[in-house]
Amino acid sequence: MSRYTGPSWKVSRRLGISLSGTGKELARRPYKPGQHGPNSRGKVSEYGMQLTEKQKLRHMYGMNERQFRTLFIKASKIKEGKHGVNFMVLLEQRLDNVVYRLGLATTRRQARQLVNHGHITVDGKRVDIPSYHVEVGQVIGVREKSQNISTIKEAVEATVGRPAFVSFDTEKLEGSFTRLPERDELYPEIDEALVVEYYNQKL
């Protein structure tokens, strides 16, 4: 399954989440496309809830199904901690996500484009793979010749706050994971146990 590249507001309304982070997609019509009102939803099965939760998380991180499933399997091999929490931490360690968390991009989609186009460095070396696994302490920066790109400068200026698990130098345009995130620092609206249940039936 390929990555969805259409309007994010359609996915936001279908899944009941704001992929833009602004909530504007849901403000006017907080119900699925095609419905005639907020009360027209039918009863959702247990499988339907599991599927919806999986789709929410996958779209939030902007991944295709193959990438998402592969990372889920990788998380299952971590011996310590809960599978669902380990999975969410691995999602946070993707390079495109770290670029977003540092405030170098306003959305994960924009962050992925910056990585794909070769504007991002890891420990001083250019890396153009969005799924690159970032370790604690690795320095994520912007290539010197890319530092005047307007979208990057605007994103940094617009960033009000950053998660406690990252540090960022606005002068150098570089930052890093200072530690791995705790579960309570990541999306309280997501029930990762439902995602685990979904894949346990599939794998």
Swiss-Prot record:
UniProt-listed InterPro entries: Ribosomal_uS4, Ribosomal_uS4_bac-type, Ribosomal_uS4_CS, Ribosomal_uS4_N, S4_RNA-bd, S4_RNA-bd_sf
Domain S4 RNA-binding per the UniProt entry, residue ranges: 93-156
Keyword Chaperone: no
Keyword Cell division appears in the UniProt entry: no
Origin: domain of life: Bacteria
MF annotations from Gene Ontology: rRNA binding; structural constituent of ribosome
Annotated spans, Disordered: 22-45
Matching SUPFAM superfamilies: Alpha-L RNA-binding motif
Keyword terms, alphabetized: Ribonucleoprotein, Ribosomal protein, RNA-binding, rRNA-binding
GO biological-process terms attached to the record: ribosomal small subunit biogenesis; translation
Residue ranges that the Swiss-Prot or TrEMBL entry lists as coiled coil: none
A GO CC term attached to the entry: small ribosomal subunit
Cited CDD domains: S4 (cd00165)
A Pfam family of this chain: S4
Entries under HAMAP family matching the protein: Ribosomal_uS4_B (MF_01306_B)
The family this protein is said to belong to: Belongs to the universal ribosomal protein uS4 family.
Subunit structure: Part of the 30S ribosomal subunit. Contacts protein S5. The interaction surface between S4 and S5 is involved in control of translational fidelity.
NCBIfam families from the UniProt entry: PRK05327.1, rpsD_bact
Function: One of the primary rRNA binding proteins, it binds directly to 16S rRNA where it nucleates assembly of the body of the 30S subunit. With S5 and S12 plays an important role in translational accuracy.
Stated name of the protein: Small ribosomal subunit protein uS4
Organism expressing this protein natively: Enterococcus faecalis (strain ATCC 700802 / V583)
